[in-house]
């Protein structure tokens, strides 16, 4: 599947429940960061990121396919540790991309004493739950993604050409070059204050 089809599919998947949301609190957030915005404008350790997040407490959105998968995982994990939870109060889906570069970007060879090139394209599903006692809660997050796709090389070098920065020459040596699936799950407990 091409990268454009993947992005289109994920966008439709994330945005389709929004058309059905009624009487709910919903938020769309777009975040971007780039070393270009930093005072020193250095590519050391990080170069750029972009994410779009949609969160809502609507029942339609809570029932979207990605949230359904992660809610099943939440029930399995949280019941396994004895957490008594209600249905989720809210859910969020985030689609993002991040790129990391070493300090010395002009070198074509690998420098084992510097951070490697790497990129991550991901989809994350998170939920907020209250416990049955209503005095505490849980926040969970399931992230699936792909490391090492060729998504930053041309973009970074195009921006660098416009702003007069050095060309990044080591993207062919990035971590998991060509693509490797990745997965992350987290569950955080919260005790509410009176």
Which stretches of residues belong to each language-model region?
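Outer-membrane pore/translocation modules
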Residues: 75-194
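Short glycine/proline- and aromatic-enriched beta-strand/turn motifs that initiate or cap beta-hairpins
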Residues: 21-61, 93-105
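Outer-membrane beta-barrel biogenesis signature
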Residues: 21-25, 39, 64-86
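Bacterial N-terminal signal peptides that target proteins for export
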Residues: 1-7
């Amino acid at each position: 599947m091409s990268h454009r089809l993947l992005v289109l599919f994920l966008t439709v998947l994330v945005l389709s429940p929004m058309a059905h949301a009624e009487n709910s609190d919903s938020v769309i957030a777009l975040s971007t960061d780039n070393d270009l915005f930093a005072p020193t404008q250095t590519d050391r350790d990080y170069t750029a990121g972009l994410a779009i997040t949609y969160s809502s407490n609507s029942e339609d959105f809570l029932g979207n396919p990605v949230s359904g998968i992660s809610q099943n995982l939440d029930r399995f994990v949280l019941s396994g540790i004895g957490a008594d939870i209600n249905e989720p109060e809210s859910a969020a889906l985030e689609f993002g991309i991040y790129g990391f570069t070493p300090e010395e970007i002009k070198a074509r060879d690998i420098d084992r004493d510097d951070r490697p090139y790497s990129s991550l394209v991901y989809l994350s599903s998170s939920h907020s739950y209250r416990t049955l006692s209503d005095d505490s809660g849980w926040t969970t997050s399931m992230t699936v993604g792909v490391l090492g796709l060729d998504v930053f090389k041309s973009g970074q070098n195009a921006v660098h050409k416009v702003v007069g920065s050095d060309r990044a020459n080591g993207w062919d040596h990035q971590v998991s070059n060509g693509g490797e699936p990745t997965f992350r799950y987290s569950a955080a407990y919260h005790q509410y204050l009176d």
